[in-house]
Curated annotation (Swiss-Prot):
One of its GO terms (cellular component) is microtubule organizing center. Gene3D superfamilies: P-loop containing nucleotide triphosphate hydrolases (3.40.50.300). This is RAD51-like protein 1. It is found in: Nucleus. It comes from Caenorhabditis elegans. GO terms for molecular function: ATP binding; ATP-dependent activity, acting on DNA; ATP-dependent DNA damage sensor activity; ATPase binding; single-stranded DNA binding. InterPro entries: HRR_RAD51_Paralog (IPR051988), P-loop_NTPase (IPR027417), RecA_ATP-bd (IPR020588). Keywords: DNA damage, DNA recombination, DNA repair, DNA-binding, Meiosis, Nucleus. One of its GO terms (biological process) is resolution of meiotic recombination intermediates. Interacts with brc-2 and rad-51. The keyword Nuclease does not apply. Its main location: nucleus.
Length: 245
């Protein structure tokens, strides 16, 4: 054998676990058929994009429910302009039945924010939260809406928020954002402008099959790894996500 053909590639223990698909390493929803697309790695930031009412928050509830049931002692943070609907979240976890509702809710740190400064402060405070492994920011477009119209100042504010998110991911905390889609360019694009979009490497898109359908389609665009734009259909039922029959 030609020695030149022996190529050794450096691989960390984390890289090995990712390659082997270690079950507890990934964050998934409660609906296993979505795993090929919605499979999140720790220490990364993901954005879920879609029109209003398409089911972005329901996806987040499902991620949160699975996380809280599989990570028995871990905490998560929830940031949003409106209060977390714990009644909706509990619908997603009822079929597990492994923990009481009080156990679940005690491990959620909620922050209601309406201003950019409040978002910045909340992200920074999460850095000091013990055993925090997941942060969800609902409707970040509503919180950062004004940054789109302030050009350089707005970009500076967006950069500051991105940097605070990166500090969280460096601690192996997974961050999930939801953002709505705009159509003013003539095609669907994430809100908050081109600069914000350029800062998010891992992105999911949720849409309805058509205007009259209750079937949703989720697809993934993860940085350089396109994987042919995997697309999976699902529905949103009374107790969470469900497969299309």
């Amino acid at each position: 054998m030609d020695p030149s053909e022996n190529v050794f590639k450096y691989e960390t223990a984390y890289d090995l676990l990712v390659r082997l698909g270690a079950e507890r390493l990934f964050l998934r929803t409660c609906l296993s058929i979505l795993d090929p697309v919605l499979e999140l790695h720790p220490g990364k930031c993901y954005e879920i994009d879609g029109d209003l009412g398409v089911g972005k928050t329901q996806i987040c509830y499902s991620f949160a429910a699975k996380f809280l049931q599989t990570k028995k002692t871990a905490k998560m943070g929830w940031i949003g302009a409106t209060p977390l609907r714990t009644d909706h979240l509990l619908l997603h976890i009822e079929h597990f039945g492994n923990q009481t509702n009080e156990d679940i809710l005690d491990r959620i740190v909620c922050k209601r924010v309406e201003k950019i400064a409040e978002l910045q402060d909340s992200l920074t405070r999460f850095l000091d939260t013990i055993n925090l492994q997941l942060v969800i920011v609902e409707n970040i477009d509503a919180i950062l809406h004004d940054t789109v119209y302030h050009k350089e100042m707005g970009r500076s504010m967006q950069s500051d928020v991105v940097e605070r998110i990166r500090k969280l991911t460096k601690l192996e905390i997974t961050v999930i954002l939801t953002n709505h889609i705009t159509h003013w360019r003539g095609y669907p694009a994430p809100a908050l402008g081109a600069f914000w979009s350029s800062q998010i490497n891992n992105r999911f898109f949720i849409e309805k099959r058509n205007d009259d359908s209750d079937i949703r389609i989720v697809s993934a665009m993860k940085g350089e790894q396109d994987d042919g734009m995997n697309r999976i259909e699902f529905k949103i039922g009374d107790r969470g996500l469900k497969a299309v029959e």
